[in-house]
A protein has these predicted regions:
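A short helix/loop element that forms part of the nucleotide-sugar donor recognition site in Leloir-type
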Residues: 195-209, 262
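Conserved acidic donor-binding segment of nucleotide-sugar-dependent glycosyltransferases
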Residues: 331-340, 347-354
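A short, well-ordered alpha-helix in the C-terminal region of glycosyltransferases
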Residues: 355-369, 381
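Conserved donor-binding/catalytic core segment of Leloir-type glycosyltransferases
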Residues: 209-226, 232-236, 245
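Nucleotide-activated donor-binding/catalytic signature segment of Leloir-type glycosyltransferases, i.e.
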Residues: 257-284
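Membrane-proximal helix-turn-helix segments that form the acceptor-binding/catalytic region
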Residues: 107-115, 119, 143-167, 264
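Donor nucleotide-sugar binding/catalytic pocket of nucleotide-sugar-dependent glycosyltransferases
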Residues: 147-199
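Short hydrophobic beta-strand element within catalytic cores of glycosyltransferases
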Residues: 292, 311-320
């Protein structure tokens, strides 16, 4: 049996709406899928108010051993060393463990794991092309340092992770070039049964949506980097043939200090329907009601959780060319990101059922081989490869001879 300790945020059982990012939900699904295939998984997670220090959920042991902040990752690494598992898998986003103050802790945390005889694997949920870091990038991502400083810091961080980990995982094909030697494992999918057309219409009506219009959906945290303004401007141009739904709350990192989401509602409240945060039991209905998911990301630096959800639910996707390169989407799923061009594409889908069917077919084809079970199998193969590569030569020889 493979024994793995993950360092990552993990959903609390009582406050799921307060997740700091999609990484917590990702960790839960991956851990459960690994456990279902016989892997012993322990998660070292941040403390969450009202949650026990230690719990066991669906076969996964969760220990809440550290607080977010400057000491988050070094403290987590110490707990992971004590766990006994040979592999420690860190799920990493730049500000995930407590904002900018937590970033310097990456190096000592990974070094501590290496000196303790552990095999650190790191999944980079965000990968930035240093050449993309300019004034516009820092403004969009609310990074409060000059572009030169941000560029050096982000590129240095990515090199550091590569050097101190035994293997690095990324979610998108285009990120493999930016992190040489990395392993691409796409986001896993929860694959749902197709929703019959009449059932989808009934769901539309129950949500107060028009059945005689194309329902376009933008889903997930409202963040400046997603190009939501472009979708809103396109909907304004497209007119009555398109009904745009913006489903998602303010990003937790921005909610308390940035008016971005409120500004969108104020500027475009008469163009689209803003429904706010969608509780987990209601997510499937919104994807079933949507005729198309819009992902006009201008410069993606991470794979898209809503993209994976759409593939799982069978909801057709229109995405930017840059996101298509990242996730390996075919040309059929690419749409212009300029508002007039996107509006034209939406009107085409609204007026031509054959084009919408072709988009649905392309989306369904891309979903094959991307279930959480597939993602777990790819991780298990990676863990086995890492363990074998770092096993003493004499033991490797004996194992192969005995096989």
């Amino acid at each position: 049996m493979i024994d793995v300790t993950m360092v990552a945020p993990y959903p609390g059982q009582h406050r799921r709406a307060k997740l700091p990012s999609g990484v917590a939900a990702y960790t839960e699904r991956l851990s459960t899928a690994l456990t279902n295939q016989g892997v012993a998984v322990k998660v070292i997670a941040p403390e969450v108010e009202g949650e026990p220090k230690r719990s066991r959920v669906d076969g996964v042991t969760v220990e809440r051993s550290f607080r977010r902040g400057a000491r988050a990752l070094p403290t987590a690494a110490g707990a992971a060393r004590r766990s006994g598992a040979p592999i420690v898998h860190l799920q990493f986003e730049t500000f995930l463990y407590g904002g900018p103050s937590s970033v310097p802790g990456v190096a000592p945390a990974l070094a501590n794991l290496r000196t303790g005889g552990k095999l650190p694997v790191v999944t980079l949920h965000q990968v930035v092309d240093p050449s993309d870091v300019d004034k516009e990038f820092t403004q969009v991502h609310r990074v409060r340092v000059p572009p030169t400083v941000a560029r050096l810091g982000l590129s240095g961080l990515q090199r550091l992770v590569r050097r101190l980990s035994v293997s690095t995982v990324v979610h998108g094909q285009s990120f493999e070039v930016l992190v040489p030697g990395s392993v691409v494992v796409p986001l896993g999918l929860d694959v749902a049964d197709p929703v019959p057309l009449e059932t989808a219409r009934e769901i539309k009506r129950s949500l107060g949506l028009r059945t005689d219009r194309l329902t376009a959906l933008c889903f997930g945290f409202l963040s400046p980097y997603k190009g939501i303004e472009r979708a809103l401007e396109a909907a304004a141009i497209a007119g009555d043939s398109v009904e745009l739904v913006i489903a998602g709350g303010s990003h937790p990192r921005l909610a308390s200090r940035d008016p971005y989401a409120d500004d969108l509602r104020r500027r475009f409240g008469d163009v689209a329907r803003f429904v706010g945060y969608v509780p987990e039991p209601e997510v499937a209905d919104w994807f079933a009601a949507a005729d198309v998911l819009l992902l006009p990301y201008p410069r993606p630096f991470a794979s898209s959780g809503p993209f994976a959800q759409a593939l799982g639910f069978g909801t057709p996707v229109l995405c930017s060319e840059s996101l298509a390169r990242c996730v390996g989407a075919p040309e059929a799923m690419v749409a212009p990101t300029d508002p007039p061009g996107l509006a034209r594409r939406l009107r085409q889908l609204a007026s031509d059922p054959e084009q919408l069917l072709a988009l649905t077919t392309a989306t369904q084809a891309l979903a094959r081989g991307r279930s959480w079970e597939d993602a777990a199998r790819r991780h298990i193969a990676l863990y086995e490869e890492v363990i074998d590569a770092h096993r003493p030569v004499s033991r490797r020889v004996r194992t192969r001879e005995s096989g």
